Curated annotation (Swiss-Prot):
One of the GO biological process terms: neuropeptide signaling pathway
GO CC entries: extracellular space
Compartments where found: Secreted
Protein name, per record: Pro-FMRFamide-related neuropeptide VF
Chief localisation class: secreted
Signal sequence extent: 1-26
Family: Belongs to the FARP (FMRFamide related peptide) family.
InterPro entries, alphabetized: FMRFamide-related/fGRP
Propeptide segment residues: 27-55, 95-99, 115-121, 134-196
Keywords from the named record: Amidation, Cleavage on pair of basic residues, Neuropeptide, Secreted, Signal
Keyword Secreted in annotation: yes
Modified residues (Phenylalanine amide): 92, 131
Length: 196
């Protein structure tokens, strides 16, 4: 590696500095010339008369020309479609003119603005022991009476039936405990009389 002499180094720095300063001055001159051209733009842009073949437009002519030549567009045919079908795709063979019954739109998803709760309640069977739901005494009574009608005449079956159906009601309404027992005794007595 050669050692650069001080004279060569000074020449190199002077050349680069002069090059950089000339670029700065040229940029300033361009900016100034742009400013001068903007100031002088009004001088050049002033109308000096109309060249041959051109004519000027008056405000009245422009006003008369405008609204008469505007083409008014009618509303699109999509707006004539019912609102319930507006977001539905045109697939699965559905046409724009096709009419549907109210029952067909009831099963559409929430995206089309329908509520899903009604269809979910219809599809999900009543599962009393799931999800923290309890059964009512009436449903248990009805179910047990339907299943065990033949074997209800023995005292053990009556006690089992009473304990299964009334335990839930006794917890909820302890003051009605005695009246429920009396009701079952009357039912048992009536069944015994029917057997005889």
């Amino acid at each position: 590696m050669e050692i650069i002499s001080s004279k060569l180094f000074i020449l190199l720095t002077l050349a680069t500095s002069s090059l950089l300063t000339s670029n700065i001055f040229c940029a300033d001159e361009l900016v100034m010339s742009n400013l001068h051209s903007k100031e002088n733009y009004d001088k050049y842009s002033e109308p000096r008369g109309y060249p041959k073949g051109e004519r000027s437009l008056n405000f009245e002519e422009l006003k008369d020309w405008g609204p008469k030549n505007v083409i008014k567009m009618s509303t699109p045919a999509v707006n004539k479609m019912p609102h319930s079908f507006a977001n539905l795709p045109l697939r699965f063979g559905r046409n724009v003119q096709e009419e549907r019954s109210a029952g067909a739109t009831a099963n559409l998803p929430l995206r089309s603005g329908r509520n899903m709760e009604v269809s979910l309640v219809r599809r999900v069977p009543n599962l009393p022991q799931r999800f923290g739901r309890t059964t009512t005494a009436k449903s248990v009574c009805r179910m047990l009476s339907d299943l065990c009608q033949g074997s209800m005449h023995s005292p053990c079956a009556n006690d089992l039936f009473y304990s299964m159906t009334c335990q839930h009601q006794e917890i909820q309404n302890p003051d009605q405990k005695q009246s429920r027992r009396l009701l079952f005794k009357k039912i048992d007595d009536a069944e015994l009389k029917q057997e005889k």
